[in-house]
């Protein structure tokens, strides 16, 4: 289906098929997060790049086991406006995910938990604490992740990218310490 902006994206029926086809990756990643005690603090978010946009966990969904209706198709982000299909709002970190995918066309998935790093792991950390959900955080994170597949968002959590969601989540598991949750209100 060609949309008004000239970009070809899936129609609503195909969006449901895409979500159903990718749902197992979200479940497998959630199991890894849960098994390693990383579904703590204020959670985090998961996303997968798909034709015409991204699939991302909804705002308020639990990383310990998202439901099918908590996977949202985002088809466009412009400035602070997010265009999506789904019964729930996409994650507040959608802008950050979108900007990472724009900067890294080689990656297809992002895993993010609100947990600090293991002491023995060396990890690039953002210099400043930047408010979550902002374009500033998206720009800083996207720029840093041009040269690495994992980083620590200062006082926020670990984020990792890879070719699929399970592999991105394995990187998060390798670096994240479940005894260091970040809780946002």
Question: Which role fits each region the language model picked out?
Answer:
Residues 1-185:
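Glycine-rich flexible loops
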